[in-house]
């Protein structure tokens, strides 16, 4: 997972032109965000290992880039934002489990195949 900054944001958007790009939005003091991030790490590792993929996930502190919340209609954190061709196609707020995140990511990736 890669930390997203204003400088790296445009490069990350370009990644979504070829396949879905996953952006995890959080704040540093959010306990639920920390748990969600760990579940996302497990799901990502499983996808990249079992499916032989190199799925990219960005992480963004929404306090440092509030314009993303406005642009993509983010109402709370944690949020897993799924971008395809630069457009938000899904927002996931209830990160219930690593398995749930895994299924959400796999479904998004399969739509692009």
Q: What would you call each of these model-derived segments?
A:
Residues 76, 81-113:
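Non-catalytic, surface beta->alpha helical segment in thiol-disulfide oxidoreductase systems
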Residues 14-17, 45-52, 112-113:
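Alpha-helix termini
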Residues 16-28:
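Short active-site neighborhood of thiol/selenol oxidoreductases, capturing the structured segment around
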Residues 34-48:
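Typically the conserved alpha-helix immediately C-terminal to a functionally engaged Cys/Sec
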Residues 62-80, 84:
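Mid-chain, well-packed structural core segment of small domains
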């Amino acid at each position: 997972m890669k930390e997203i900054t204003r400088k790296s944001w445009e490069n990350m958007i370009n990644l979504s032109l070829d396949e879905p790009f996953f952006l995890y939005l959080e704040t540093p003091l959010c306990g639920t965000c920390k748990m969600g991030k760990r579940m996302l790490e497990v799901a990502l590792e499983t996808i990249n290992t079992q499916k032989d993929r190199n799925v990219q996930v960005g992480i963004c502190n929404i306090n440092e880039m509030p314009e993303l919340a406005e642009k993509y209609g983010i109402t709370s954190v944690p949020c897993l934002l799924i971008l395809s061709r630069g457009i938000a196609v899904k927002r996931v707020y209830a990160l219930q489990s690593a398995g749930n995140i895994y299924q959400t990511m796999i479904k998004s990736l399969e739509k692009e195949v």
